[in-house]
A protein has these predicted regions:
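Ligand/cofactor-recognition surfaces for anionic moieties
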Residues: 1-156, 163, 167-177, 191-702
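Ser/Thr/Pro/Gly-rich low-complexity, intrinsically disordered segments
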Residues: 159, 179-184
Length: 702
């Protein structure tokens, strides 16, 4: 794992924004040329579409209002925070090699990624540094675009603005020079800092200082703690200057706990061979180490997950309830009213990792809280929260569960089904309780169609759907891979056919297409959550199958596209929700076309090229199902993967099948009307690449 950082035009844009603000105060005559370059870059990178703020082109820009232009100022304020979010996004730097611990910069960045996150016993590295420096914001939860207020370096006379690349004072009067990097050891990539000092105006700039300093401390710690023989216990912390007590505590933990655990990555191979030989393999915890669970290290152990009777855990309930309110707030701000209906996909693997964040959120949305046993902390019941306590109406939630969730968590199916029935029986108004109102309405409908009262009541209360017993997935992957579909309606129907099986506390997998279509016809929101940043929504087909498939199905049945949201629960103390289009854009800019990620993939030959192709496939499939990809993204992928000469040569030499497949996929996107704004010359180049790749493959006898 590593920070995405900025690159190319995005890096230039950040520098120009700083110059613009500086010129407003010091040299207004420079504003016009800076503005012209800013506008050109904004349109070049399509940021005006991404941020939803229309900026006229250079030709159409109104003259005479440069210094006070409200639209441009609004854009720059928004863009500043957005660029900071992209810069601090976590992406993978290459692939894990089985049995090998990362080395050099990969090890440094992985340690920082894990140590950054707090848990019950630790502050987290960057938070500890900020606390020792007396900085009055939380780097893990603060708005990166917010103006920096009363944030000065300790033991220095107040000299705002601070500057990146200058001396950063430590709490005891010592200092460390952030640029150039002090690390000269072979294989160390220095921390990237601005060529010229940059004013620190917003919290995102200060967070970058913390991240750079944390990386330098960790790199020095690794150099003094690690040798060819392994990780000696109690390694000295030979860093320049004195370190604050909170930072020292974090560094001690890294030296004595985290680094030794990472060094034991070779246990993956050792224990695999032990298992094949019928020997004992030690057990260990499971989860995401970058989400505050470093106890899952070292890897290579026989991991255990959770006691399903304790799910959702109290910790998961806290996050789930918070995430529910964040979602409702976002929808209410955008639509001016509370949401009434929502579809949520829930997977078994994420439930195991988190202890039940998603099911907790679903319960919170309908206004139900689990009840835990006082000793075992197992879930023994639930209680209905009054609307007066909720402070909002309930939300009618329908779950689309994965096959693994169905197999692993039958107790949660029972819990949610019982909760739905209890909420449906409440005597509340339709405004307070859309779920009960919908159940009553549907019950009458089914009675009119000849069902008995019991049958009508049962069918109207179906709120958990999945694939039929023994089946897994959502039915779309085969269609996408084989190109065996004509329109979005084909994909929608495949999803419906695969998903229309109802699960209750009394029945497993009842074919219920009419009830499922009823749910789809009323659904306003499609929500997909992600619990960690060790991967993203373009790393797996599951995301487009579940969220994209549900989105397409709702559009097919109701005739209206739902609001598609993506929940980011990677920071448990600060869950966020974005529109799906925003998340796609974020992943596209931070990873997909990021030279840093591409370079990491290129270290892995054949497999690295396959990762690039898979990313394009999932981007295409998301667009086919949810219409969430902009034309410039297809062009950007073509430019980064196929039209960049060094990357093209890498792919051609290591995996010519990928060159053919990616070019064909881009051509398919154009043929299906997903990529419309494209030059004929670009399409011709892609066709030529297909032919060239076919020739290489044939010449190799494959």
């Amino acid at each position: 794992m590593t920070r995405a950082e900025l690159y190319g035009s995005l890096n230039q844009l950040e520098g120009l924004i700083d110059e613009y603000y500086e010129a407003q105060t010091l040299d207004p005559l420079r504003l016009a040329p800076i503005r012209d370059r800013l506008i050109a870059l904004i349109h070049q990178e399509n940021l005006h579409h991404t941020l939803g703020i229309q900026i006229p082109s250079q030709e159409g820009y109104p003259q005479g209002r440069v210094g006070s232009d409200a639209i441009l100022t609004q854009f720059l304020n928004t863009a500043d925070g957005y660029l900071c979010e992209l810069k601090e996004a976590q992406i993978r730097d290459g692939l894990h090699i089985f049995g090998q611990c990362p080395q050099h910069t990969q090890l440094r960045d992985l340690v920082v990624a894990i140590a950054r996150n707090p848990n019950a016993n630790r502050l987290g590295l960057t938070r500890a540094i900020a606390l020792d420096w007396g900085w009055n914001f939380d780097p893990l939860t603060a708005d990166l675009g917010a103006e920096l207020v009363n944030c000065v370096v300790p033991r220095l006379p107040p000299q705002p603005p601070l500057e990146r690349g200058a001396l950063i004072a430590l709490p005891f009067g010592k200092s460390i020079d952030l640029a150039p990097s002090p690390f000269q050891g072979e294989g160390w990539g220095g921390v990237k800092t601005s060529a010229t000092p940059k004013p620190i105006r917003i919290i995102g700039d200060a967070v970058e200082i913390l991240e750079e300093y944390a990386a330098e401390l960790v790199a020095k710690l690794i150099e003094t703690s690690v040798d060819g023989e392994g990780y000696p216990q109690g390694a000295p912390l030979q860093v320049d200057g004195e370190i604050g007590i909170n930072t020292q505590t974090e560094l001690n933990w890294i030296a004595t706990k985290l680094l030794p655990a990472l060094q034991q990555t070779n246990l993956e191979m050792v224990n695999l061979l032990r298992g094949l030989n019928g020997e004992y393999i030690p057990s260990g915890a499971s989860g995401a180490p970058t989400r505050g669970k470093p106890e899952v290290l070292p890897t290579g152990r026989n991991f255990y997950s959770v006691d399903i009777r304790a799910v959702p855990t109290e910790t998961a309930w806290c996050l789930g309830r918070k995430a529910a309110e964040v979602l409702i707030d976002r929808y209410t701000q955008e639509h001016g009213e509370y949401p009434q209906t929502l579809g949520l996909s829930i997977w078994g693997t994420s439930t195991m990792r988190t202890g039940g964040d998603d099911i907790a959120q679903a319960l919170a949305l309908i206004g139900v809280q689990p009840v835990w046993d006082g000793v075992s902390r197992r879930v023994v019941d639930f209680e209905i929260l009054p609307v007066s306590i909720l402070g909002r109406p309930r939300v009618d939630v329908t779950l689309r569960i994965s096959g693994f969730f169905r197999d692993a968590f039958p107790n949660l199916i029972d819990l949610f089904d019982n909760a739905v029935k209890a909420v449906a029986a409440l005597e509340e108004t339709s405004e307070q309780n859309p779920l009960a109102a919908q159940v009553q309405q549907e019950q009458m409908k089914w009675l009119e169609q000849g069902l008995t009262l019991d049958e009508a009541q049962t069918r109207s209360q179906y709120r958990i759907f999945g694939s039929k017993p023994g089946a897994y997935g959502a039915g779309l992957q085969g269609l996408i891979e084989s190109q065996n579909w004509e329109t979005e309606a084909d994909l929608a129907q495949a999803y419906i056919n695969w998903s229309a099986y109802a699960y209750t506390n009394k029945a497993e997998g009842i074919a219920a297409p009419e009830a499922f279509n009823q749910r789809l016809g009323n659904m306003q929101i499609v929500l997909q959550n992600q619990d960690n940043r060790e991967h993203d929504l373009l790393d797996s087909d599951d995301y487009y199958q579940f969220q994209g498939g549900l989105t397409a199905a709702i559009k097919q049945v109701s005739g209206t596209a739902p609001e598609a949201y993506f929940g980011d629960n990677s920071r448990t103390e600060n869950p966020k929700v974005r529109k799906l289009t925003e998340e796609i854009d974020r992943v596209y800019r931070s990873r997909v076309v990021n030279p840093k990620w591409i370079a990491g993939a290129m270290r892995h030959g054949y497999k690295g090229a396959s990762e690039m192709a898979a990313t394009l496939d999932f981007l295409f499939a998301y667009d086919a199902t949810a219409n969430c990809v902009q034309d410039f993204m297809y062009q950007g992928v073509a430019d980064a993967y196929l039209f960049d000469e060094s990357v093209r040569q890498f792919i051609e030499q290591n995996n010519p099948w990928v060159q053919r497949d990616m070019a064909e996929r881009l051509l398919e996107a154009n043929q299906r009307g997903l990529w419309e704004d494209v030059e004929l010359g670009t399409l011709e180049r892609l066709r030529l690449m297909v032919n060239e790749a076919e020739g290489i493959i044939e010449s190799q006898g494959n």
